[in-house]
Amino acid sequence: MHCYAPDLYCHNIADVPFASLAKKNIVNICLDVDNTLAKRGSLLIDYQTVKALDKARQNGHIKNICIVSNIIWGRSREERVRKIAEQLAIEHYFAARFWERKPNAKPFLEAMRLMDSQPENTAIIGDQIFTDVVGGKRLGLFTILVRPLGEDHWTTRLTWRRHREIRILKHLGFE
């Protein structure tokens, strides 16, 4: 399969079929923060997202969740990741610094270590092909791409990543 092609493409986290994933023994979930769980820079998480994650956990479709975010630098950004994890009652999170950011292996390997999971039973849910999907594919994770919740970081706009992603999604038949 193409390294840019997500295994699943959903509108948002609430649309992810956690029951179907659990039937395939994919019960450990890595979650991106910016524009996946919350709009960039925000602490507000959509009610439908909270409800979907809670329901999946209560039904046993999710065993573990680890938030994996590229914070690049800054204590305030790491604090935001911690607060979001607390809101969702998520025990594990990894705030990747500049030199270890996604799509590098370290954030995913650390998340799997924290969840005591393996690639074959772990998924990554994120809004970017070049970080979340490519990084997950490199390690053999099940990759789920969701539409971004809000505006991109200036570096994403500067490098035209989102424009390239749209072209890739159209080429793959997702858009």
Per-range role (PLM):
Residues 2-29, 38, 43, 49-175:
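Asp-based, Mg2+/Mn2+-dependent phosphohydrolase catalytic module
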Residues 32:
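Active-site residues of response regulator receiver
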